[in-house]
Amino acid sequence: MAAALVSVPRIKLGSQGLEVSAQGLGCMGMSAFYGPPKPESEMIKLIHHAVDAGVTFLDTSDVYGPHTNEVLLGKALQGGVREKVELATKFGVSFADGKREIHGDPAYVRTACEGSFKRLGVDCIDLYYQHRIDKRVPIEVTIGELKKLVEEGKIKYIGLSEASASTIRRAHAVHPITAVQLEWSLWSRDAEEDIIPTCRELGIGIVAYSPLGRGFFSSGAKLVDSLSEQDFRKHMPRFQPENLDKNAQIFERVRRDGSTERMHAITARVGLGSPPRKRRLPHTWHNKNRQLQPERGGTVCEAYTG
């Protein structure tokens, strides 16, 4: 018998009025970075099942694919689904000849927004993040253009991803920032020094990705053996032989003292039933989805209401 669906809590993200599901569905791994793209029809069914289960905060970016993840999500949003969700996407990163480029100039911001509209099939984005900060362009200039998009009704709320505390303050002075997205886990805790206290002070919500260390804290070193050549984690320094042994020792230590169970308790409060084709979704929606496997995880929100 399929497990009964459990109500997903809803929270205020930040202090500007945005309400989202406490668990979010990061869609990146459906199309990019975590191995080959997954079958489109299965991913659309998965998204629909998540929404039906109450996970309505959907996260993507124009760089995932690039572009293909937004196209996928756009198809999933058809048929009245758009009205049921809080849609977040990002701009500011592109790849040219294999080289990453960061953009924050006003013309790029506006062009990127229009491009996301077309791929997603929408005329308004609920939460629009600057994916990475362009150090060549003052943050005040970038946020100024985003503020215009808010005033024009094209986006509702502004977010930043991977921004410093000082950048967050400067941005917030131009227009209220609703959310900051960052990596936050047992081995990524630098944000606790300045960024998270700054967000608390300013009433900015935190959207944490990879709370289980990109799957390491749920699987340990054996995770690396299962990664395909197309999985970007295979090339991350933390998973290389010179670091893996030490990280494996840390994993065993936290596993013995129960920290991994506590991490599961933090990120997995929602039991989900059976999706299409009777494939069961795990209880956990950990870091940024990765096909919703417990070692690969969803977006977790922490709300600060100021």
From Swiss-Prot:
Site features described as Lowers pKa of active site Tyr, chain residue numbers: K90
Pfam families xrefs: Aldo_ket_red
Encoding gene, per UniProt annotation: IN2-2
Family the entry assigns: Belongs to the aldo/keto reductase family. Aldo/keto reductase 2 subfamily.
GO molecular function, one term: aldo-keto reductase (NADPH) activity
Region (Disordered): 272-306
Xref: Gene3D superfamilies: NADP-dependent oxidoreductase domain (3.20.20.100)
Keyword annotations of the record: NADP, Oxidoreductase
Active site feature: Y64
InterPro entries linked: AKR (IPR020471), Aldo-Keto_reductase (IPR050791), NADP_OxRdtase_dom (IPR023210), NADP_OxRdtase_dom_sf (IPR036812)
Name the record gives this protein: IN2-2 protein
Induction comment: By N-(aminocarbonyl)-2-chlorobenzenesulfonamide (2-CBSU).
Keyword Oxidoreductase: yes
Tissue occurrence: Leaves and roots.
Binding site for NADP(+): S210, P211, L212, G213, R214, G215, F216, F217, S218, S219, G220
Binding site for substrate: H131
CC annotations in GO: cytoplasm
Biased composition (Basic residues): 276-289
UniProt source species: Zea mays (Maize)
